Swiss-Prot record:
Protein name, per record: Small ribosomal subunit protein bS6
Statement: the UniProt record of this protein carries the keyword Glycoprotein: no
Pfam families assigned: Ribosomal_S6
Record HAMAP family: Ribosomal_bS6
Record keywords: Ribonucleoprotein, Ribosomal protein, RNA-binding, rRNA-binding
Membership in a protein family: Belongs to the bacterial ribosomal protein bS6 family.
The encoding gene: rpsF
GO MF term list: small ribosomal subunit rRNA binding; structural constituent of ribosome
Species lineage: Bacteria, Pseudomonadati, Pseudomonadota, Alphaproteobacteria, Hyphomicrobiales
Region of interest: Disordered: 96-148
GO CC, alphabetical: cytosolic small ribosomal subunit
Function: Binds together with bS18 to 16S ribosomal RNA.
Highest taxon above the source species: Bacteria
Listed GO biological process terms: translation
Length: 148
C-alpha cells in the first residue's frame, strides 16, 4: 500500500466537533476499502489566502494515510460530494514524518514568544540619528524657511 499525506479544509461555520466527525466519516470510508489512517493533526481555524466557495477561513486537518489508490480515490470522491469540505489535497510520500508537522511546530514557536514580534525602535521622531553619512545641517537664511 502507498503512503499519503492528506490535507482537508472544512467550512468555517461548522464546529470543531463536526470537523472531527467528518474526519471519522472519511476514516470509515478509507478503512472499508482496505486503508488505514495514521496521525491526525487539527490545525484549527485559519484564514484562507483567497476565498473558496465564499469562505475566508477554514478548519485545516492533516491526515497520514496508508492505503491503496482505489481507497484514496473513493475517499476523495466522497469529499467532493460533501458540502462541508471546501477543498482537499492528497500527496503521495515515501514515508510519513515523525512528530509534529511544520505547521504545528510554527504555531508552538509563536506561543513561546512574548507576544510582541515587532523590532525595537529608538525613541524619538523622524530623525533617529542613524544617518551618519550626512554632514551637519546647514543653517537657514530666513526664519520662515522659504526659498533658496
Amino acid at each position: 500500500m502507498a503512503l499519503y499525506e492528506h490535507v482537508l479544509l472544512a467550512r468555517q461555520d461548522i464546529s470543531q466537533q463536526q470537523v472531527d466527525a467528518l474526519v471519522e466519516q472519511f476514516k470509515g470510508v478509507l478503512e472499508a476499502n482496505g486503508g488505514k489512517f495514521g496521525k491526525v493533526e487539527n490545525w484549527g481555524l485559519r484564514p484562507l489566502t483567497y476565498r473558496i466557495k465564499k469562505n475566508r477561513k477554514a478548519y485545516y486537518t492533516l491526515v497520514n494515510i496508508d492505503a491503496p489508490a482505489a481507497a484514496v480515490a473513493e475517499m476523495e470522491r466522497q469529499m467532493r460530494i460533501n458540502e462541508d469540505v471546501l477543498s482537499f489535497l492528497t500527496v503521495r510520500v515515501e514515508e510519513h514524518e515523525e512528530g509534529q508537522s511544520a505547521m504545528l511546530t510554527r504555531r508552538d514557536d509563536r506561543r513561546e514568544r512574548d507576544g510582541d514580534d515587532r523590532p525595537r525602535r529608538r525613541e524619538g521622531g523622524f530623525d533617529r540619528g542613524d544617518r551618519g553619512d550626512r554632514g551637519p545641517r546647514r543653517p537657514r537664511d530666513n526664519e520662515a524657511g522659504e526659498g533658496a
